[in-house]
């Protein structure tokens, strides 16, 4: 349905890492722009992805515009994917690649999403706004890669899941147990 509203030759930014998107039949009037976290066959891909204490760094390889070193002040590979999607949309609509990368490097998290606070030798990552299964999985994956000696996590409720609530919370518990946490703590009404 999104494609139906796009004019002839419009860029359509798609995740190359999603096998279902790659297999989808796209209308001839759109121009797909593929991004990937690993596959250099995509139009734009991220290489040498590293999680650092204050964000992510990676090499952005754009088949049209060249190669750039990028650092974003956001944690997790999912945010690298978000940055690639934003880069693809902006550059294919005519923005200067260097300006887009500068904008990405100045990105600020909103609300209570992956806010990093350093105090007295302890790093706290607050990521509690509107928790849902995907955001919690991304937070645990990011947390697992974070450079530190011991990891503690306080995990709260994921609301508004209806009949899927128990199953989603149990899955989150399994992921937390497998994530290398020193001490997972959970608070839920279940």
Language model features with spans:
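Short, small-residue-enriched loops and turns at beta-alpha junctions
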Residues: 131-132, 159-163
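Glycine-rich phosphate/pyrophosphate-binding beta-alpha loops
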Residues: 112, 129-136
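Acidic, Mg2+-coordinating active-site environments of NTP-dependent enzymes
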Residues: 1-123, 148-149, 174-177, 181-183
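Charged helix-capping and loop-helix junction motifs
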Residues: 137-140, 165-175
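Glycine-rich phosphate/diphosphate-binding loops that line cofactor/substrate pockets in enzymes
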Residues: 143-151
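Amphipathic alpha-helical transducer elements in NTP-driven molecular machines
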Residues: 80-83, 133-137
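Conserved small/polar residues in nucleotide/adenosyl-binding loops
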Residues: 188-189
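Short beta-strands and strand-loop turn motifs
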Residues: 15, 126, 152-157
């Amino acid at each position: 349905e999104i494609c139906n509203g796009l004019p002839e030759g419009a860029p359509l930014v798609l995740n190359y890492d999603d096998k279902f998107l790659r297999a989808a039949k796209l209308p001839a009037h759109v121009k797909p722009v593929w991004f990937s976290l690993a596959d250099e066959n995509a139009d734009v891909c991220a290489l040498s992805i590293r999680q650092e204490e204050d964000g992510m760094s990676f090499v952005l390889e754009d088949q049209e515009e060249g190669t750039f070193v990028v650092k974003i002040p956001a944690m997790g590979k999912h945010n690298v994917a978000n940055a690639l999607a934003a880069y693809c949309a902006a550059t294919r609509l005519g923005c200067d690649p260097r300006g887009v990368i500068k904008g990405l490097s100045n990105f600020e998290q909103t609300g209570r999403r992956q806010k990093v606070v350093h105090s007295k030798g302890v790093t706290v990552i607050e990521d509690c706004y509107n928790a849902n299964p995907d955001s919690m999985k991304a937070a645990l994956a990011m947390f697992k890669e974070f450079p530190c000696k011991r990891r503690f996590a306080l995990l709260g409720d994921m609301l508004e899941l209806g009949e899927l609530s128990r199953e989603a919370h149990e899955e989150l518990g399994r992921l937390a147990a497998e994530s290398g946490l020193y001490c997972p703590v959970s608070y839920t009404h279940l």
